[in-house]
């Protein structure tokens, strides 16, 4: 995937503020069909221990408010929810099939930066 302006700053902010297990970019930026008008679509996977996903989503948007250079859509889900839904028709299935994993905390070699 070619380097996309502004995306590294967003990823770093998500990592420091949300402590995610995985961060996926999906939609037009992941499949290379984006234009200047398109937004970033992120699916962020967090631990099953996180119970207040709505609060975490609000925190995610607040954390990038001053650094984002285009519109951003964020979906936050737990690891078990993602695993349960990724094989059926769902956003999770789309993310799994066509998304780009930007960060994987659970990779065998440790933290992976893509």
What do the predicted segments below correspond to?
Residues 1-22, 30-36, 46-114:
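Catalytic core of pol beta-like nucleotidyltransferases
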Residues 41-45:
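Short, aliphatic-rich beta-strand segments
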């Amino acid at each position: 995937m070619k380097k996309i302006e502004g995306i590294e700053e967003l990823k770093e902010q998500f990592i420091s503020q949300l402590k995610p297990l995985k961060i996926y970019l999906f939609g037009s930026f992941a499949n290379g069909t984006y234009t200047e008008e398109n937004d970033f679509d992120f699916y962020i996977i967090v631990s099953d221990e996180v119970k207040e996903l709505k609060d975490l989503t609000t925190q995610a948007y607040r954390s990038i408010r001053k650094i984002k250079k285009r519109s951003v859509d964020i979906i936050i889900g737990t690891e078990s929810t993602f695993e349960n839904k990724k094989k059926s028709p769902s956003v999770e299935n789309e993310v799994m099939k066509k998304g780009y994993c930007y960060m994987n905390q659970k990779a065998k070699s440790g933290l992976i930066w893509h």
